[in-house]
UniProtKB/Swiss-Prot annotation:
Entry-linked PANTHER family: CELL FATE DETERMINING PROTEIN MAB21-RELATED, PROTEIN MAB-21-RELATED
A Pfam short name: Mab-21_C
Family note: Belongs to the mab-21 family.
Species, as recorded: Drosophila pseudoobscura pseudoobscura (Fruit fly)
Protein name, entry field: Protein mab-21-like
Length: 368
């Protein structure tokens, strides 16, 4: 197919702008983030070493591999989550019956005695391994470790939450989340994935993702807000499903990872709004939906990135206006749950302003 010369010129100019944006803005963000991660991980490693001395069941899994720390997720420029993987989930059955959107419970296997579990004192009368009880014990240990740490003058534990959150150097907030890795199984609540009749992802990648599995995190879930006491109690024992590794595997190939880096940079520069209605994780999920809409690798060539970003922001505007953002693997889970309607409304206006600038100004990326 012949392409008009003026279209080729416009496309070439856009690719140049995008490359320059990546070289300047995106790389600057990545450098700043990696510097922050290195700084906080050195401190958290020291604290977790002390925790392990006090309680050997909490073995630190925060290690550096090929120049990067495994299990660290960037929530925003100054907020991070570190996952601490626990051992010996084996005597429990994984149960996700849809009662708690985005969550599952771990129930003592039939015929297994409590004493066979490494986590015996955290098992409820009903035989569930309580996420909240483990987190409470871990929080106490971390608080004690902070008092003993050589970094105690620059680390404070944030006390108004059931989660383990540290404030480091009055600049960073770091959440440390106990978790179990669930390999070789796939949750029933995500059984619909991948969608039939969509050629992405390739069956080999689907098999890889399902074999890799998912994580169960000990953290609060917005899905259970305003529930009755019984449901709230059950939610305290439940574990939050996380597909962090699966998502990263799916974004390999083409310029998908590059697209995500640009989305995160645009978010940090223009969508850091009161009430934090839009996170990098919202954008990551919408990027996965965009991959389904555009399943071919050539649709993720560098010449197409601007179109993909515009498509994702138009999706985001729609989600903000309808006040619902379905999780990619768990569509019944609304990721806007708990966000104020006014914050979502203001965010929709700001995203539209940003999108309109990108759609109407051929040189938009020079000043974004």
């Amino acid at each position: 197919m012949l392409v008009p010369p003026d279209m080729l010129v416009a496309q070439t100019r856009m690719i140049y702008q995008m490359n320059r944006y990546c070289a300047e803005r995106v790389q600057a963000r990545m450098f700043k983030t990696s510097t922050a991660i290195r700084e906080i991980c050195k401190i958290v490693q020291d604290i977790l070493k002390e925790v392990e001395l006090q309680e050997p069941r909490f073995i630190s899994s925060l290690v550096e591999c090929n120049g990067r720390f495994e299990g660290v997720e960037v929530i925003s420029p100054n907020e991070f989550e570190i996952v601490l993987y626990l051992n010996q989930m084996g005597v429990f059955n994984f149960v996700d019956d849809g009662t708690l959107p985005g969550c599952a419970v771990l129930k003592l296997s039939d015929g297994r005695k409590r004493s066979m579990s490494l986590w015996v004192e955290f098992i409820t009368a009903s035989g569930y391994l309580s996420s909240r009880k483990i987190r409470s014990r871990f929080q106490t240990l971390v608080a004690q470790a902070c008092d003993k740490s050589m970094y105690r003058d620059m680390v404070k534990i944030i006390g108004d939450t059931t989660e383990v959150k540290l404030r480091i150097r009055e600049r960073y907030v770091v959440q440390i989340t106990p978790a179990f890795k669930c390999s070789g199984i796939w949750p029933r609540s995500a059984a619909h994935w991948p969608m039939p009749h969509i050629p992405w992802p390739h069956p080999n990648i689907v098999a890889e993702v399902k074999t890799e599995g998912f994580d169960l995190l000990s953290k609060d879930s917005a899905a259970m807000q305003n529930k009755n006491n019984n449901a709230a109690s059950m939610e305290g024992d439940a574990w939050v499903l996380s597909f962090y590794e699966a998502e990263n595997r799916l974004l390999q190939g083409g310029c998908r990872r590059r697209c995500l880096s640009m989305l995160k940079t645009l978010r940090d520069r223009h969508l850091e709004l009161p009430g934090s209605p839009i996170s990098a994780y919202h954008l990551k999920n919408l990027l996965l939906y965009e991959c389904e809409k555009h399943p071919r690798d050539y649709e993720w060539d560098e010449s197409c990135i601007a179109d993909r970003i515009n498509g994702i922001f138009l999706q985001l505007i729609s989600c903000l206006q309808y006040r619902r953002c379905p999780h990619y693997f768990l569509p019944s889970l609304d990721m806007f749950k708990g966000k104020s309607p006014s914050a979502l409304e203001q965010a929709a206006k700001q995203v539209w302003r940003l999108t309109r600038e990108m759609l109407t100004n051929a040189n938009a990326f020079e000043k974004l």
